[in-house]
Amino acid sequence: MKRFFVFLGVVLATIGSAVRAQEVDSIAQLQKASWGDAKTEEAAEYIPDVYVHSRMGYEHDFLEQVGRFDGNGLYLGIEGNISPNFSYSFYHCIASSDSQGLFGFDNTQWLTVSYENDWLNLTAGKNAVMVGSFEYDGYDIDSYYFMNSSFWNSFDCWQWGASASFYPDDDHELTIQVCNSPFSFGEPNLFAYALGWRGEMEWFESLWTANMWQYDKGSYMKSMNFANRFDFDDFSFDLEYMTRATDIKDLFTRDFTLMIAPTYQFSDWGCIKGKFGWEKCGEDELMEYGYDGSYMFYGLAAEFFPIKDYEDLRLHASWGHGCNRSHILNIGVTWKFSLTQAVKDIVSKCRNKSANL
């Protein structure tokens, strides 16, 4: 923990330096503009967004008749720009009930550097294995695991690799990804391949992928995943189908997930989410499911934002039933605190105080 506070001190000092550097750059841009340089562009934002993210609450298991207060993790995130085209992103679990240490990469969910222009994005580092599912695509800290599929609860998604995304137009994105296989377990020469399409139209959003996850030399688990989101003003729903098999002839019959997840945004300060799914889990040693055979999972969640126009503080109440055959209730709070904004506010107050002396 001592090393963490040293690291956090370095981060805060870096933010302070970046704030000052940004001010100098902005002043230089204004001076150039005042000298009549019509070609001067706006100053780029190079101050990193550094934040901490956490969730805690009370959870009750009705099958076991046990309940307790607990936290779902404390995360540190850093995002920023190196240049107009290069950016970086970092998200690390500082502490959780199953943390294995502070500085090991096992607790780093993602650590990436990206190059992006109008038609291309190249990303390298540790990132999520691309899978066509909105349930899977969301932040862990925003998910209610007892409402989710066994696939979500079993898949080792954070892997080192690289991806290339192409933008044929404003509404479509095509992605190719190569990374370590989620079934490699640290062994070399086992890789995963993904081909994905994300579309964002006026009332429809898609996230489709075709995947191959290597588990032995020349042997792959194949997967097809189709996530579809339909938006109608304050109401939306996701319709998803995912299927997996080591033998291509079993692709649509042995191991699959089918789910529908509606969301109703009843006001600016709250929404209601639901989920109902049917999953068939084959007897497969690769996935280590918590349950074999067919079963249904479902749940409801209500989310509230007590501060107007501020979604970084969220209250929730959720109930779900999944592969553990229990009914679980969770009531809690999720919060995100921007260290960068705090430093900016401190610098601004100090500057104003000095100006008034």
Spans of model-derived segments:
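Detector for outer-membrane/organellar transmembrane beta-barrel domains
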Residues: S34-G36, E41-P48, L195-Y298
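Sec-dependent N-terminal signal peptides
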Residues: F4-A13
